[in-house]
């Protein structure tokens, strides 16, 4: 990114603190976001790893992940996930942002931490509701709720993986998601 700054116009920005604050906010969000859109880094996971019966297919086209399947609680199951293992070296990220649309259902963002011995039963989560129109979501790490036993502390440099999940009840999954990033 190249930024040309005309010093003669700097005075205008200093006289308009709201403009300056807005520009700094936009610049900081774009400069420090960690994009997580590489389809090669994501994988589908279902409760079949523990004997469940849920099914999931993942497709990626034109920068959009498509999750389609069925969550069923049969045989003590009940989840499908689009999951990405990550390795962050600093603690500067405050949350996850993405755009999603789907079949007017509730989905969850799951964060699993390093050092947790019992995934997928121990994680942090936040629910979000989708509609048939694209919506932008920003979920702060501070707003995540602990599920299960959590020995590790929530810091962005302590994240093991991030998942978008259909969870906990019988329903059809039909979700499109894009522009996934840490902010």
Task: Report the location of each language-model feature.
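Sec-dependent signal peptide recognition
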Residues: 17-25
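Beta-rich carbohydrate-recognition modules and glycan-binding surfaces
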Residues: 32-183
């Amino acid at each position: 990114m190249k930024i040309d700054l005309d010093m003669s116009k700097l005075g205008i920005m200093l006289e308009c603190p709201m403009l300056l604050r807005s520009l700094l906010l936009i610049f900081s969000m774009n400069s420090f976001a960690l994009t997580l859109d590489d389809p090669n880094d994501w994988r589908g996971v279902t409760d079949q790893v523990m004997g469940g019966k849920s099914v999931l297919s993942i497709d990626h086209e034109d920068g959009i992940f498509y999750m389609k399947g069925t969550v069923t609680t049969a045989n003590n199951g009940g989840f499908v996930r689009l999951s990405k293992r990550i390795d962050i070296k600093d603690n500067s990220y405050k949350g996850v942002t993405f755009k999603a649309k789907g079949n007017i259902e509730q989905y969850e963002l799951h964060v699993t931490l390093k050092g947790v011995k019992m995934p997928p039963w121990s994680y942090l989560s936040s629910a979000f509701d989708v509609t048939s129109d694209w919506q932008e979501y920003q979920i702060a790490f501070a707003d995540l709720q602990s599920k299960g036993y959590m020995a590790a502390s929530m810091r962005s440099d302590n994240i093991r993986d991030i998942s978008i999940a259909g969870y906990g009840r019988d329903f059809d999954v039909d979700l499109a998601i894009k522009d996934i990033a840490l902010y």
